[in-house]
Structure formats: C-alpha cells, structure tokens
Amino acid sequence: MTKGEIAAILEEIAALLELKGENPFKIRAYANAARSLETFGGNLPDLQDEEALAKIPGIGKSIAEKIKELAATSSL
C-alpha cells in the first residue's frame, strides 16, 4: 500500500466515525493523521517502523499502530 492509499483509508475512517457520531477529537485525530501522512517525505518501509511513525506530527500511538498494520497487511 502507498502512503496515499493509507491516508485515504484514514480519511474514510474519520468520515465513518463522524457518521456514527463519535467523539469529535477522535475524528479530528484521524483527519489530521491522514493529512500528516500525505505530506510525510518517507517511503513505505518507513511506515512499518514505529520510530519513524512517532516522528510524524499528528500521528499518535493508536493511529501509528493502524498505519503499521495497513502497511504490512493492507487491511485492518
């Protein structure tokens, strides 16, 4: 998976959370993570490295785990 594809999935998760009426902070976290990932200068192998993910502003531990899983398996 490319980082663009992963960012699109994170945006889709944010939209689905909004439709479900979830916590606005959680929705914003996914949307911000998607934007941060789109502008991230690294390549796909870096998305499987927890240290590299931790350096991306706007990506917390929980979302970093989801990104790592998506990069490794192409599914959640």
Where do the model's predicted regions map?
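Long, highly charged, low-complexity intrinsically disordered interaction regions
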Residues: M1-L76
